[in-house]
Regions:
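NTP-dependent nucleotidyl-transfer catalytic core
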Residues: 1-126
Length: 126
């Protein structure tokens, strides 16, 4: 798949639902306009059976990068899903998940992401 460098599409990607780009929107725009293929990654832990609305914007933006021809990776952490993420949890006990629970959670997450990200696209797969 060739890289789409249409400036209006890139401008929308960098402004719609985007608060900040690090190091800067200007630098990322220059790279996107150059036609250089990027690899964009989102990693997550399937600690529950469903996504929440807060995830949607990230996945919509990931799909926009994919539509422009960039390689996107939607990674679900197996081990980190099983042990739980301690970030901002203080001393709260974390429920340990079995491998089977994580596999089932991952399947439901992929089903929920499919309407937003074209994970089955043969030309530029996720």
């Amino acid at each position: 798949m060739t890289i789409d460098t249409t400036e209006s599409k890139i401008d929308e990607l960098l402004t719609r639902s985007v608060e900040e780009v690090i190091p800067s929107k200007k630098e990322l725009k220059e790279v996107l306009l150059s036609g250089q293929k990027l690899r964009i990654y989102i990693g997550t832990d399937a600690t529950g059976t469903s996504l929440h609305l807060g995830h949607a914007t990230n996945y919509i933006i990931l799909e926009k990068f994919r539509q422009l021809g960039h390689e996107v990776i939607f990674l679900v952490g197996d081990f980190t899903s099983r042990i739980g993420d301690p970030t901002d949890k203080g001393d709260a006990a974390r429920k340990q998940l079995t491998r089977e629970e994580v596999i089932e959670n991952t399947k439901t997450w992929i089903d929920q992401v499919k309407p937003v990200i074209d994970v089955d696209n043969a030309e530029n797969p996720v």
